[in-house]
Each structure stands twice: as C-alpha cells, then as structure tokens.
Swiss-Prot record:
Enzyme class: transferase
Keywords carried by this UniProt record: Allosteric enzyme, ATP-binding, Cytoplasm, Kinase, Nucleotide-binding, Pyrimidine biosynthesis, Transferase
Region entry Involved in allosteric activation by GTP, spans: 32-37
Keyword Kinase (UniProt): yes
Lineage of the organism: Bacteria, Pseudomonadati, Pseudomonadota, Gammaproteobacteria, Oceanospirillales
Name of this chain's protein: Uridylate kinase
Activity control mechanisms: Allosterically activated by GTP. Inhibited by UTP.
Subunit and partners: Homohexamer.
Organism: Alcanivorax borkumensis (strain ATCC 700651 / DSM 11573 / NCIMB 13689 / SK2)
InterPro entries associated with the record: AceGlu_kinase-like_sf, Asp/Glu/Uridylate_kinase, Uridylate_kinase, Uridylate_kinase_bac
Pathway(s) it belongs to: Pyrimidine metabolism; CTP biosynthesis via de novo pathway; UDP from UMP (UMPK route): step 1/1
SUPFAM superfamilies (alphabetical): Carbamate kinase-like
Amino acid sequence: MSGGEKEMPTNKERSPRYNRILLKLSGEALAGEEGFGIDPKVLDAISLEIGQLVGIGVQVGLVVGGGNLFRGAALQSAGLDRVAGDHMGMLATVMNGLALRDALERSNIRTRLMSAIPMSGVVEHYDHRNANRHLKNGEVVIFCAGTGNPFFTTDSAACLRGIEISADVVLKATKVDGVYNDDPVKNPDAVKYDALTYDEVLEKKLGVMDLTAICLCRDHSMPLRVFDMNKKGALLNLMLGGKEGTLVEAAQ
C-alpha cells in the first residue's frame, strides 16, 4: 500500500527521501505559545516549511486537529453528548484548515482544502481520487473534519488518509523530538527511542497515537515517524535523508 521508508543520504541534487507524505499537525501546534486560537506567526512558519518541501518536489497531504479551538472532554463531563462534541471538534478542524489554506496561498503555494463533511461553497468534499489528482498536480491538500465520523481521532484520520493517498510515510508533528519511554517534560531521565515496531508501541503502551491509528498503520505497512515540528528545518532535513524523531514500522 505504501512506499515505505528509504534511507538515503543528502545529495547535491537535494532529491527527497519521500515522494508523497501525510503530515499530521495538532490543533495545539497552531495556537503557538498562547495555548488557544490560531497564531499567525505559526501559520507563516508552517507555510515556509511546507513551501520548502513543495520546492524539492514532495507531494504534501495535511491533516490538522482542532484542539486549539475546541476541547470536548470538559463539556462531555458536564453532560454534552459525545457525538455532538465530536461534530463540534470536526468543525474546529475545518476552521484550522481554512486558516492554513489561506496562509499557504498567501505564500503562493497552491492548496486544496477537502472536508470529510460536505460543506458546499466553503470547502471541497473529500474524494480520494480527486485528492490524488491534486497531489500529482503539485498542490498541497489539507484534509479536515477528521474521518467524518464520531469516535475517531484526527490521528486515526491522518493514518486513514495516508493509506488512501498511498503516502510513503505518515509524519506526526509534536512538541518533543520523538517517542520516549516516559514523559520527557516531567521526567528528565526519560529515554528516547530511535526506532520501534508497531507491536512494541502497543505492548509498551507508549501513547504515540491511539490504538485504531497504530493498528491501521500496522495492518497496511504504513511507516510512521514522530518528530519535533518546532525544530527549525527538521521537516526538510527528514526529506533529505536526515534522522529526526522516532520511526515506527513493521519488524524487519
């Protein structure tokens, strides 16, 4: 289904390691230091990073979360229906997608925004055939509204979209530089993993992604890499053969 990881050194031609990627951005990442809302500086920084990838010929699909605009947990504990809460979360991802598309297009990067929920006149409805055509034409494609169904996380949506568009890898951007055996923020002695198998992630309960997302990647042999998006140039370095974060893939 997927092309898999290719280990290749950086070369003078700056040939990318991957032809097509699915990048998962959390909603919190868009909030920057504010912790809520959308930080224009973050949008500009993300646009710059993605523009560099497009410039070397990488086809980029994006899935964005919505946690910077809506968190359903507190309301659900107060009695909000889970399905209603999940639908509100999906709408938050659409707002983030609109902001991302605007930022990318202001940087002269041709971008499509596709929603799993039909929103005529606002965004294009998701169709994997059209998404593949857009990617082949060199356009960045942002996928929003999750899977379109409640009870599924945006991490699961990212893995699903990555599989559907035959991405070479799913890249999860986080606030830390990979996967650790404990929370590195709380435990300074936490040990980072350079590589893991899907089964090790599940057995060790490392919390890289939810169970559904990890199982999707495992069952379809989709490599997953967790890296620090806040590290300037990390994404481009990954594309050019550098080692960033933690790679999760099938056992060799």
